[in-house]
Amino acid sequence: MSGGEQKPERYYVGVDVGTGSVRAALVDQSGVLLAFADQPIKNWEPQFNHHEQSSEDIWAACCVVTKKVVQGIDLNQIRGLGFDATCSLVVLDKQFHPLPVNQEGDSHRNVIMWLDHRAVSQVNRINETKHSVLQYVGGVMSVEMQAPKLLWLKENLREICWDKAGHFFDLPDFLSWKATGVTARSLCSLVCKWTYSAEKGWDDSFWKMIGLEDFVADNYSKIGNQVLPPGASLGNGLTPEAARDLGLLPGIAVAASLIDAHAGGLGVIGADVRGHGLICEGQPVTSRLAVICGTSSCHMGISKDPIFVPGVWGPYFSAMVPGFWLNEGGQSVTGKLIDHMVQGHAAFPELQVKATARCQSIYAYLNSHLDLIKKAQPVGFLTVDLHVWPDFHGNRSPLADLTLKGMVTGLKLSQDLDDLAILYLATVQAIALGTRFIIEAMEAAGHSISTLFLCGGLSKNPLFVQMHADITGMPVVLSQEVESVLVGAAVLGACASGDFASVQEAMAKMSKVGKVVFPRLQDKKYYDKKYQVFLKLVEHQKEYLAIMNDD
């Protein structure tokens, strides 16, 4: 500012709770990350398909990373705090103490994780009701949503958990409550995972029909009867106790939270794309699909009017971008699947030794090894006779069938490093083919998508990014800040502080294009063939099932 004092810089803290770690960032008004920290969190798997965490362990990790990113900063310059987290279920008693979600009665483990599939029987019964709320989750509710998990708790842990419970939080809402003492829920969590309607509120008939009439009787006090849009300022901001825990000042604005994938969408989808030669530059923001890819992947598309896509969650009003309807496709395991395939291979120990010797990650080494063995052909052509169906944890979208299994065809007796690298490539391609499958379902229902915006851990893998471009035939935009989910969380804090007039304004000013990866259109014919095989795989799996179940 000429002729006057420059305004002091304003900062925001974004906190992201993922599946295996908590991460935090200090972000400025331009969306630039100034400091970053991460801290692992514990996961328990007491039995198959049961995945649990501890809310106390998660909060402690939030405190560690937040203190780290604000070291050396004038705390008066920190204007807002935003949280995002996985859509896991936190259970507390009436005094806000943890309750066990396990048969062992261990109250420390009071979180049913998002990827937990214990409630298969319950979700099947819910889907048999054909209740009208199901049309807003693609016609079929997922076992990963909260209603089946709540029903499982009532039916299996009545005495030690259900009867004592006072509060059921989505994890993002637990964090904002812990920071402010305000039990209001985020519209994002309730609309996306709990069947809440932004227009009509809770549907009493649904909860009564599935056997959870308890919530209706207490006016939904246990699951949320005050609902705020993401980015809204909560109460009086950070409480003195939470401020001490986090190393911040009391009263700092705290935002109504987002689910982690939605924070990623917020962090990328509104970027200014001018000057990059992208077709979406002259198109509305509804032409963009945000793909948030980490342990699992979520595919976020927005529209001005509601679009109902079979097998794809939504439409959810204002669940990510205010004023827009959101459809959310997804794949239950992506990063986790790649790890599973690579780490389970006989050549994995050799890979570890060679990658360590080169000071590379195992995936950087595999990518360079693929370049070595591809010779004159494009790297993707190495899988001409190896094909993978990636639903090792069921299909979330667009088939919405949790009974589907993974498939690999084209295996040989070879178990060397070349074999591992090609299996890794085929797995990455299968995930990208799954994205194409989801896009085609969304476009058939009325979406018009031209550009992918990728973020999350897998977006740091150049092979993963290029395969998504080649297989979908669409350009892939990567953010200037690779930690887009944390930028999205910081956008929430910025909105809560009042420094921006709207979420849209904060999105536009805090998210920037870093790199664009264009599809290699000369390879289109090959990937069209791979896609035909991909669709045949699931068709054949269903045929095998029918044969084996035939009396």
Swiss-Prot record:
Identification of the protein by name: FGGY carbohydrate kinase domain-containing protein
Primary role: Postulated to function in a metabolite repair mechanism by preventing toxic accumulation of free D-ribulose formed by non-specific phosphatase activities. Alternatively, may play a role in regulating D-ribulose 5-phosphate recycling in the pentose phosphate pathway. Can phosphorylate ribitol with low efficiency.
GO MF term list: D-ribulokinase activity
Tissues in which the protein is found: Expressed in kidney, lung and small intestine and to a lower extent in liver and detected in cerebrospinal fluid (at protein level).
Pathway: Carbohydrate metabolism; pentose and glucuronate interconversion
EC number in record: 2.7.1.47
Disease: Amyotrophic lateral sclerosis: A neurodegenerative disorder affecting upper motor neurons in the brain and lower motor neurons in the brain stem and spinal cord, resulting in fatal paralysis. Sensory abnormalities are absent. The pathologic hallmarks of the disease include pallor of the corticospinal tract due to loss of motor neurons, presence of ubiquitin-positive inclusions within surviving motor neurons, and deposition of pathologic aggregates. The etiology of amyotrophic lateral sclerosis is likely to be multifactorial, involving both genetic and environmental factors.
Family membership: Belongs to the FGGY kinase family.
Gene Ontology cellular-component annotations: cytoplasm
Biological process per Gene Ontology, one example term: pentose metabolic process
Keyword Transferase carried by entry: yes
Organism: Homo sapiens (Human)
